[in-house]
């Protein structure tokens, strides 16, 4: 929103100076909210008349769009004259024209984002009731699983809730904003503050394309040295995944994915319970974190459920992001060494090549760390 405000101010300043000079009239007071509503109405019209607005849209298309934007619709020139944005563009020198086009393009792109946020904002409100119902059911299932004393009892819980689990997974995997909606149930700031919504959207929105790519990458891992555990949980997952629409529509081998996930789970459990290096790393991290986090502050907050926990994390997000970042960066080399040793020991391959954990982690950090 701050960037949009700067772009809007630049647009208004250039426009007012030229309009007043050419007409001899004085501009009215500026009302940004009023004008943004006008732009939000204009953008779909411009896209229909000219073309879709993208970061790579050509300058001549932007200039064409200027012909359809009349200044008399905006607060600072309301009903004064029939001048269009292109008439101001025509009065500028070449350097000014280039800057004006860039400003107008970026402003339209930011308005486009605002339209998307408004739409999501509306849907978040509408979907809250369903999300609350789903969340309660999920918590209930987890509670029953934790209370199960045998594998058969836990399997029965999963079987009894089979239809709900499949329908919920289909909803989650078909809606890139589903995770965001679940968070909105517990953190009301997403409903009341659009800037917070935009920040969370960048962090928690996951596209179907990204999911499919990630699932394929995991499926293609070769972990043949780890024995497959065909327990009842794995059998349940294997029966369930073929019914997931994302797997059906993208021709993903559900059995292969389930097998790899089972092996990864077995491997992680084994490392957590028997790998001395992993144990030392976790202990050192916990001890180091204790010196940076105020336990008293957490106690005073009175965290007693998921909602209060998410609110606490949201309110202290910057502080904990800094702590996590410092902890990770100070231990990155150690983490990579431990993971590479595990990969080497179990001969884990992708595309017939041994996984290079340093390349993988550094690439991920460089591409996606800005989100976190």
UniProtKB/Swiss-Prot annotation:
It comes from the Viruses. Signal peptide: none annotated. Its main location: host cell. InterPro entries: Poxvirus_A6. Keywords: Host cytoplasm, Virion. GO terms for cellular component: host cell cytoplasm; virion component. It is found in: Host cytoplasm; Virion. Pfam families: Pox_A6 (PF04924). Belongs to the orthopoxvirus OPG132 family. Lipid-bound viral membrane assembly protein that plays an essential role in immature virion (IV) to mature virion (MV) transition. Functions in both crescent-shaped viral membranes formation and its enclosure to form immature virions. In addition, participates in targeting mature virion proteins to sites of virion assembly to ensure their correct localization. This is Virion morphogenesis protein OPG132. The lineage of its organism: Viruses, Varidnaviria, Bamfordvirae, Nucleocytoviricota, Pokkesviricetes. The gene is OPG132.
């Amino acid at each position: 929103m701050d960037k949009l405000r700067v772009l809007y101010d630049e647009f208004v300043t250039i426009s007012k100076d030229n309009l007043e000079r050419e007409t001899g009239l004085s501009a009215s007071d500026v009302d940004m909210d009023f004008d943004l509503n006008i732009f939000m109405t204009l953008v779909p019209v411009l896209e229909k008349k000219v073309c879709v607005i993208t970061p790579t849209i050509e300058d001549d298309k932007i200039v064409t769009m200027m012909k359809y934007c009349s200044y008399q619709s905006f607060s600072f020139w309301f009903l004064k004259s029939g001048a269009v944005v292109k008439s101001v563009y025509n009065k500028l020198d070449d350097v000014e024209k280039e800057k004006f086009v860039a400003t107008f393009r970026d402003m339209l792109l930011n308005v486009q984002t605002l339209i998307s946020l408004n739409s999501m904002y509306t849907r978040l409100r509408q979907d809250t009731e369903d999300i609350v119902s789903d969340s309660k059911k999920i918590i209930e299932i987890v509670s029953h699983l934790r209370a199960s004393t045998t594998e058969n009892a836990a399997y029965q819980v999963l079987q009894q809730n089979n239809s709900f689990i499949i329908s919920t997974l289909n909803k989650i995997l078909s809606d890139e904003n589903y995770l965001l909606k679940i968070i909105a149930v517990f953190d009301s700031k997403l409903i009341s503050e659009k800037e917070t919504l935009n920040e969370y959207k960048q962090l928690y929105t996951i596209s179907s394309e990204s999911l499919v790519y990630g699932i394929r990458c995991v499926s293609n891992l070769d972990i043949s040295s780890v024995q497959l555990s065909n327990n009842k949980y794995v059998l349940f997952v294997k029966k369930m995944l073929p019914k997931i629409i994302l797997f059906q529509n993208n021709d993903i081998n559900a059995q292969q994915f389930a097998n790899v996930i089972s092996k990864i789970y077995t491997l992680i459990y084994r490392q957590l319970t028997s790998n001395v290096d992993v144990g030392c790393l976790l202990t050192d991290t916990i001890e180091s974190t204790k010196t940076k986090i105020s336990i008293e502050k957490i106690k005073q907050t009175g965290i007693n459920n998921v909602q209060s926990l998410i609110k606490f994390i949201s309110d202290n997000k910057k502080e904990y992001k800094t702590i996590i970042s410092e902890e990770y960066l100070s231990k990155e080399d150690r983490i990579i060494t431990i993971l590479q040793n595990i990969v080497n020991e179990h001969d884990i391959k992708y595309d017939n090549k041994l996984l290079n954990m340093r390349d993988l982690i550094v690439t991920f950090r460089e591409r996606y760390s800005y989100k976190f």
